[in-house]
Amino acid sequence: MGQDYYSVLGITRNSEDAQIKQAYRRLALKHHPLKSNEPSSAEIFRQIAEAYDVLSDPMKRGIYDKFGEEGLKGGIPLEFGSQTPWTTGYVFHGKPEKVFHEFFGGNNPFSEFFDAEGSEVDLNFGGLQGRGVKKQDPQVERDLYLSLEDLFFGCTKKIKISRRVLNEDGYSSTIKDKILTIDVKPGWRQGTRITFEKEGDQGPNIIPADIIFIVKEKLHPRFRRENDNLFFVNPIPLGKALTCCTVEVRTLDDRLLNIPINDIIHPKYFKKVPGEGMPLPEDPTKKGDLFIFFDIQFPTRLTPQKKQMLRQALLT
């Protein structure tokens, strides 16, 4: 039986984002290996990080809630059927300190997250550090989830961040919101990085961290993307698979393609449609290809007469 991420964080399945963050904050500070002397702290700290990594991500949480840990880590089909391409399974990166750092915005939990008396210090995008040589805070990475339509046409995303801004005295700071604008270009691929230099927390003795957004693709109801190509799964009755057909595909730009199939469609068959994939980032006027796969639907019952007709047609 898969592990229960909600139990790991001590929350219920209907918990909201704020409750998930609060639970992770409390448990991570309690079980951090540099804070706790318990032998089990390292493993608990890792489990807490993995649970938060999943539940704080709407897409991962949605898959986990519906399909459990097995579906999350093993992958799920975009459309159910025997020949359906599957999503890539989730793998925890195994670095709980990375989750801790990204959550609090610093690297050393005891120099930046606790004062001399052990009280917590609130941080966001990199923390205020003590006096000394100016040093830039470690870069902060955030996922930027985009739909295939966003990546096909391009779009503009405005993201609000909260960060510490130095006051006029040059020492104290105030948390203020700022809007960052990202101009998404047609054809951007998953993993594209957008860097906002020195937009992290300000402090008297630090250089603000760079904030980096990393493009992640949302699941799409019709297509799966592979590099610059699109995969489409078309359900088809066995009769049409054997006797030719025309496939209709509604594209991302809302055109209806009518693709004639004159071959016998077998389980490993696919149809390539050149130039109907995603725009190429280097030249958006050019596109990748569309690959059509088929989910052959077999009948569940046949009358004796139909069986005899099939024998005569296929076995003689």
UniProtKB/Swiss-Prot annotation:
Residues that span the membrane, as ranges: none
Main location: other
GO terms, biological process: axonemal central apparatus assembly; chaperone cofactor-dependent protein refolding
SMART domains according to UniProt: DnaJ
Gene3D superfamilies: DnaJ domain, Urease metallochaperone UreE, N-terminal domain
InterPro entries named among the record's database cross-references: DnaJ_C, DnaJ_domain, DnaJ_domain_CS, DnaJ_subfamily_B, HSP40/DnaJ_pept-bd, J_dom_sf
Stretches assigned to the J domain: 4-68
Name of one Pfam family that matches: DnaJ
One MF term in the entry's GO annotations: protein-folding chaperone binding
Tissues of expression: Specifically expressed in testis and trachea.
Domain of life: Eukaryota
PROSITE patterns attached to this UniProt entry: DNAJ_1, DNAJ_2
Keyword hit for Metal-binding: no
Keywords, in A-Z order: Cell projection, Chaperone, Ciliopathy, Cilium, Cilium biogenesis/degradation, Disease variant, Flagellum, Primary ciliary dyskinesia
GO annotations of cellular component type: cytosol; motile cilium; radial spoke; sperm flagellum; sperm head-tail coupling apparatus
Cell compartments where the protein resides: Cell projection, Cilium, Flagellum
Cited PANTHER family: DNAJ HOMOLOG SUBFAMILY B MEMBER 13, DNAJ HOMOLOG SUBFAMILY C MEMBER
Linked pathology: Ciliary dyskinesia, primary, 34: A form of primary ciliary dyskinesia, a disorder characterized by abnormalities of motile cilia. Respiratory infections leading to chronic inflammation and bronchiectasis are recurrent, due to defects in the respiratory cilia. CILD34 inheritance is autosomal recessive.
Function in brief: Functions as part of axonemal radial spoke complexes that play an important part in the motility of sperm and cilia.
Assembly description: Homodimer. Component of the axonemal radial spoke complex 1 (RS1), at least composed of spoke head proteins RSPH1, RSPH3, RSPH9 and the cilia-specific component RSPH4A or sperm-specific component RSPH6A, spoke stalk proteins RSPH14, DNAJB13, DYDC1, ROPN1L and NME5, and the anchor protein IQUB. Interacts with SUN5. Interacts with IQUB.
Protein name as catalogued: DnaJ homolog subfamily B member 13
Organism: Homo sapiens (Human)
